[in-house]
Amino acid sequence: TKFYSQNKIGINQENEGIGMTFKYGDYKGEMIYRNFNKEKIILRFPKSAALDEYTVNDTWIKIPWEIKEEVRKIGSFNCKKATGEFRGRFYTAWFTEEIPLPYGPFKLYGLPGLILQAEDSEKMFSVNMKSIEYPTNQEFEITEPVEKERKNIKEHVYAQDHIEDILLEKLNSKMPRGVSFSKNLSKKDTKRVYKIEKLFEWEN
């Protein structure tokens, strides 16, 4: 399965003789590639102001779902409720056995049916099915994303946790002598409060 989003943003700012241009994002966007036969998950991140595009070999984690008795209708599908914890967040998911595929959005998978709706308890993550065609006669070619730079999951997490430091170092390396940027340390998200993944398996 593959999830993607496109993001292209350009910023051009001139102030006191200093010109800066940031362009990031690309037509490929962010991807989550999963191979269920090989239990393999590859992430792809587009170019940002701080980092070039790169891929990540993530860890295949089976979420310990607990299926509840509650049911609801989503669109034309009968769905069951399931709850589970994944990397520091507690999720509620609604899946349908009418589409008996263990897939879902983001990194949520492993239920006996397709996940059509999911949300974490703090509402930092929320996804709802808008429309679906099942079965379908369309054929899709899904290929593993490849980039020159590859990181393991620990390297990726470190980079994201220190993204401000990396960007600051990059900016300062391009500034004239005597000119530098500094950051507001009070705004650093040290506990990953605003990130979807808050706690990783090696941090327990």
Model-derived features with residue positions:
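Extended soluble regions of mature proteins
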Residues: 1-204
